[in-house]
Every structure is written in C-alpha cells, then in structure tokens.
Amino acid sequence: MKVIILRTFYIFNLNKNYIGLATSEPNKIYIILKSIYSYNDKNIVIPFNLFKEVCNSINVEFFNKYFYDKLVNDEDYTVFKNIHMYHNYFTNEESKMNIFKSHIKIKSNREDNIFLLNIKDITNLFVCDFINEYYNYFSSSYKK
C-alpha cells in the first residue's frame, strides 16, 4: 500500500501596503502570517485584525472562473462550487483546492501541482506551507 504525503499550501492576497516588504523581505511576511496561523489564544481579535491589515479578501468568483477556464478541457479536473480537484494518474498528482474569502487552500502530493503552476500568473499572492517552512511571493515581475 502506497502512502501519499500531502502538503498544504495557503495562498493569501496581500494588501498593497505590504507588497514592498514582500518583494524585498518575503521572510517577514511569512513570519507575520505564521504567527497568525499559529496563534492559540482564545482572544482571536488580535490575529484577525492583523490578518485584515496584511491581507485583502480573495475574489472567490474570479478565482473559480480563472481555474475553470484554464482547466475545463483537462479530463483530470473537476469542480464543484469552490472546490477544485485534480487527479492525474499518469503524473501521480492528487490535488484539491478550496477557495475561501480569506485565503485559498491547496492540499497536494506535489509541490509543483497544477494549481500552483497556474496561479503564478496572478500578481500579489503570497504562498505558504507552514508545516514545511516554505513561502513564495508572486509579484507582477514573476515569470516562469
């Protein structure tokens, strides 16, 4: 029996006031987001307010349409409401993406999954994998 190890990627839409910091020192944005992610006090007002300052909401309709238009002709892709799935047995990729108003969450057995590869074209998104200490900022200057 093969064990599939899934990675969880969180994608945030950065506020324009933090784009400069994300470009010059992305590790500081990662530290802020990780502190929000790891916050375990019962008072959630502090991390909620910090999150609202650093991140903008996700345009759910835009991202649903964006991924649908990109992947609709791929037989390995399915979508239901805000949940996008990709199961490719030839490349052994198993990926699931949930689009929320606060963030996008991708669970995948691959770091180079179909959703991250396609989302790189959208600017000002910050990607984190808190468990594996991974982060990346997709700016307007980013090209494959």
Annotate each language-model stretch with its function.
Residues 1-101, 112-125, 132-144:
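Acidic (Asp/Glu-rich) sequence patches and key acidic residues
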Residues 103-109:
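Active-site periphery "cap/insert" segments of enzyme catalytic domains
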